[in-house]
């Protein structure tokens, strides 16, 4: 026989209304009581009846998690999976239903999408700088939050402070004596790339340094190289770095600052295949898109963050907007510079 909300209330020694409020995110319940009820519900195996609650409130309590290029992604990363875990972690403890969609806005508008799927809110990832979806999302009566993005509406975004993180990584290299830095920026057009470049330029400008065209490796989204043995951003970084090395060799730059761990993986392969060493010939840094950089040889210096925190915080912000319709300030998830073996100290060189 299925466990009911009354069973949870009886076991926890509280009223049915208190259990309902604790499991649906109301703030009139103390933290201690909420934790006790949640632990009791988990122990008994209670599953909230989302459909029943939706009928009573005439709301679906359903969140759409939209990852537009989910079916087209070539890279094998755990960022998306960890963000989904974070979203589900919040929603499962607050009585919300979440469904993942690989929605193509060219096939159906967001207004049509919300109507056909009866969603009360939208979480969307990977918005690019000139994203036409943003204006459409602003016009529909359904709250949304951009995840792992910094869209043009600050109160509707959850992500890392990319400019600050890139500036910190640049300062880390400068502090270690690197003044000839090659920036492997990756695919053009993303908000992340633009903000990270702002951070790099800011930190270098503070040292009266600048970047020239020859100091940047980037490429158009979807650009592919031929005969490269790896895929996605790694493939493109590998190809671009091979071209760079054939033209400049070593000595022109002492460090490569990558806007993605996956870009760093491609850069590393090109450097190794050309017979150069990391960090003796090129120091190398990434930007926290993976959890495997620390297992590289040498271990990759990178910007670390947890996508699970991003997913959880995004779902929480969206839930607040669904319930209270309030605008809040943009929240940034924490990060840190993980200094490892891929950067050589050249201060005395």
Feature annotation, model-predicted:
Residues 91-102, 201-234:
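Short beta-strand elements in bilobed, periplasmic/extracellular small-molecule ligand-binding domains
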Residues 62-171, 175, 246, 250:
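Alpha-helical recognition/docking segments in bacterial nutrient-uptake
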Residues 1-61, 344-349:
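N-terminal helix-turn-helix DNA-binding module of bacterial transcription factors
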Residues 238-349:
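Flexible loop/turn connectors
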Residues 36, 78-93, 191-211, 236, ...:
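Short, solvent-exposed amphipathic alpha-helices that sit
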Residues 120-125, 182-184, 229, 233, ...:
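Periplasmic-binding protein-like
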Residues 158-184, 193-205, 233-246, 264, ...:
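Hydrophobic alpha-helical segments within soluble ligand-binding/sensing domains
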